[in-house]
Design a protein with these regions (language model features):
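Metal-dependent phosphoester-hydrolase catalytic domains
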Residues: 108-115, 139, 201-218, 224-335
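N-terminal, active-site-proximal structural segment of metallo-dependent hydrolase catalytic domains
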Residues: 1-101, 159, 193, 214, ...
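Active-site metal-binding loops of divalent metal-dependent hydrolases
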Residues: 10, 41, 166, 222-224
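Extracytoplasmic mature domains of secreted/periplasmic and thylakoid-lumen proteins
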Residues: 79-138
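Beta-strand-turn-beta hairpins that frame and shape the catalytic cleft
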Residues: 1-5, 107-112, 131-135, 139-175, ...
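A solvent-exposed, charged loop/short amphipathic helix patch at secondary-structure junctions
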Residues: 169-193
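Short, flexible/disordered intra-domain loops and linkers
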Residues: 45-59, 90, 174-179, 230-241
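A Trp-anchored, charged/polar loop motif used as the substrate-binding/catalytic surface
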Residues: 20, 129-150, 189-206
């Protein structure tokens, strides 16, 4: 049975901005997937379910301006807040937007697993990872969202999704807890290295759940990095990241020991952002990343962007009413 997994940066989507955005079109896009990760969902995710208010009429209005009212009851959803006050994180500034992630999934296809205490394991922010300061790594500006999803027809198979929005610009020095002697491009690449080397490998290796026999792990989101094959300019994300048994990134695909190696592939070469000043595509920032087991076992075809710009009436209208990013899709098949 095939399943469609999506990633979509919805560009500062908030409950307050609902009047200026085409929620019907955004909901129609979401319906093309079985499960989707959203980036740049603001204001505590109120746009998902509606803003909680006391009076009945206010509740009705809030519901009308939500994605829930357009998706229906066969969707579950969860908003995640990556903000932290920990002293170990480099960014100490104040993001007044309140940017977060969201997972939305069809309840007739997926469910959250249950732990040994009988409690549902809902998506969460993933913070349990290590960084290598000798390689310029730090804690991420935004820790990723992490969701475990079991298939209803294959309860022992599990899809593990790690959604990310890699930092675009280096924060100003007054908003950093430590001095950084590299620029924004290197910071983006370092963040990807943390995601691949530390977070992906740890989540992929976790077989400690009695209810999970086969986990397939996928990073998805807005990397703010291009694949060179896309034709977009640098900074680049490597098409293949090779990691040894000590979780060190190797320089080339051929410089590795015989055992304990991760080959992690980053896919999706279509341009997926719209140019700020003209009506055309700009960058190839949105990707999926997964290991060879996942690629050879369940992936069907090449990931791609959805052709939604024409549906919206052109670049300008899409950019104003929907987003400056195009949703991307990965199709998998499990039997």
């Amino acid at each position: 049975m095939s399943y469609k997994i999506g990633s979509f940066n919805v560009r500062n989507l908030s409950f307050g901005a609902a009047a200026s955005r085409d929620l019907d079109m955004i909901a129609d896009i979401i319906k093309e997937f079985d499960i989707i990760a959203l980036q740049e969902v603001l204001s505590e995710g109120k746009i998902l379910e509606g803003s909680p208010v006391k009076d009945v009429s206010g509740q009705a209005i809030a519901y009308e301006h939500s994605l829930r009212s357009r998706l229906g009851s066969n969707w579950d959803m969860c908003w995640l807040d990556p903000k932290t006050e920990s002293k170990w994180y480099p960014y100490i500034g104040n993001d007044s937007r309140g940017e977060g992630f969201a997972f939305l999934w069809r309840t007739d296809k997926f469910k959250c697993p249950v732990n040994e205490k009988g409690k549902e394991v809902r998506p969460r922010i993933y913070r349990q990872y290590r960084t290598d300061s000798s390689k310029g790594e730090m804690k991420l500006i935004r820790d990723p969202g992490y969701g475990r999803f079991q298939l209803l027809n294959l309860p022992n198979a599990e899809i593990r999704l790690i959604t990310t929005h890699i930092v675009f610009g280096k924060p100003s020095e007054e908003n950093l807890s430590k001095e950084i002697d590299f620029g924004a491009y290197t910071m983006r690449q370092n963040e990807f290295n943390v995601l691949a080397r530390s977070i992906y490998t740890s989540i992929s290796d976790d077989y400690n759940d009695v209810n999970c026999v086969v986990p397939y792990t996928i990073i998805l989101g807005d990397y703010n990095l291009n694949l060179q094959e896309s034709g977009a300019v640098s900074p680049y994300v490597p098409a293949v990241t090779v990691i040894d048994s000590q979780k060190r990134i190797l320089e080339t695909e051929f410089d590795y020991p015989d055992k304990g190696v991760y080959f992690i592939h980053t896919k999706q070469t279509n341009l997926s952002t719209i140019n700020k000043d003209s009506d055309n595509y700009a960058n190839n920032y949105d990707h999926f990343t997964y290991d060879r087991k996942t690629e050879f076992s369940i992936v069907r075809g090449a990931p791609c962007r959805l052709n939604v710009v024409e549906r919206a009436g052109g670049y300008k209208n899409y950019k104003e009413k929907v987003s400056d990013h195009i949703p991307i899709m990965l199709e998998i098949d499990l039997k």
